[in-house]
Design a protein with these regions (language model features):
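Short, small/polar residue-rich loop motifs at catalytic or cofactor-binding pockets
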Residues: 118-121, 182-184, 271
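Short Gly/Pro-enriched turn/cap motifs at secondary-structure boundaries
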Residues: 28-31, 113-117, 175-181, 263-267
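Extended C-terminal regions of large enzymes
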Residues: 27-30, 35, 189-205, 218
Length: 299
């Protein structure tokens, strides 16, 4: 039996980062999946996304996501127990090799991730008049989490132990005192050591893809935060390419022709919030996803 009293101290680790389109993207380190979002951005940077058709952008993101999530499920775990090769995954040579594995005209099959799904995440972003910013995300994984709460305050404990693996030799294997791989990743942007703004995406496993899609919409396609959040979404997950209804049946047919198994989910894909500082005038521009409760407001 592992003594729970040993877990009363929080673990504070340095953020990880990568550059994308002139901005520095800051993400949560392992045992979080922030490196998955950074890897996706590093791969997408190798494509001229501005000139690609909608079909090709959806396809490239789907193929990059399948590979990035496969690498996530292979390597990510609590670094206190198993070293996680963050620098190796994000190195130019490795990223070039990963991109070379992406076919531009054919869907590649990967074993579907067996990471458990969970939709119950809340995200908020705030920036004050002094330029201090908060990017906050919270989730207890399931309804009422583990079902266990603190007797003094009624705070529920999460049930993220579901994300452990049962293979004894896997980096994310279940073990006492160990933190499981998790999906919740609040993001932050800077440029030339100045704050650009906080951003985040809800939606369980979608979050890493959501980060990449949100930033690509803004920095490749020139959208403002609200437009970038409103834009139609796709997500290659569990062997299926999910498309929101707004993509339409014609696009689904085109992508099916590339070998994707396409599905229109019954509910929207994810949600998000973002606050971005306009570099030209310093004005803060916010966006709030209409797929979820929330709104953008100034004070």
């Amino acid at each position: 039996h592992y003594p729970l009293r040993r877990q009363r101290q929080m673990c504070i680790r340095d953020s990880i980062r990568a550059d994308y389109r002139g901005h520095t993207v800051w993400e949560c380190p392992p045992n979080g999946q922030g490196v998955t979002a950074l890897l996706l951005l590093r791969m997408m940077e190798r494509f001229d996304l501005e000139t690609l058709s909608d079909r090709d952008r959806i396809h490239v993101l789907a193929e990059a996501a399948k590979l990035a999530y496969h690498l996530r499920d292979t390597y990510l775990a609590d670094p206190s127990f198993s070293p996680v090769p963050v620098e190796w995954l994000l190195a130019d040579e490795q990223v070039d090799g990963f991109v070379a594995m992406i076919s531009r005209d054919k869907a590649t099959e990967y074993a579907p991730s067996d990471f458990p799904d969970h939709p119950h995440t809340v995200y908020l972003a705030a920036v004050d008049e002094d330029g201090m910013a908060v990017s906050l995300i919270n989730s207890i994984f399931d309804d009422f989490g583990s079902g266990i709460s603190t007797p003094e305050y009624g705070v529920l404990f999460h049930s993220r132990g579901k994300a452990f693996r049962l293979e004894a030799d896997h980096p994310n294997a279940i073990e006492g005192g160990k933190r499981p791989l998790h999906t919740i990743i609040p993001g932050m942007l800077s440029q030339d050591d100045r704050l650009v703004g906080p951003f985040g995406v809800m939606g369980g496993q979608y979050q890493a893809v959501g980060h990449a899609m949100l930033l690509s919409n803004m920095f490749n396609l020139g959208m403002n935060p609200q437009q970038a959040l409103d834009a139609p979404r796709s997500f290659a997950h569990a062997g299926v390419l999910q498309l929101e209804d707004s993509h339409g049946a014609e696009m689904a047919g085109i992508l099916s022709g590339l070998g994707h198994e396409v599905d229109f989910p019954s509910s929207p894909i994810g949600g998000g919030q973002a606050i971005i500082r306009d570099a030209a005038n310093g004005v803060l521009v916010a966006g709030s996803d209409p797929r979820k409760d929330g709104h953008a407001s100034g004070y």
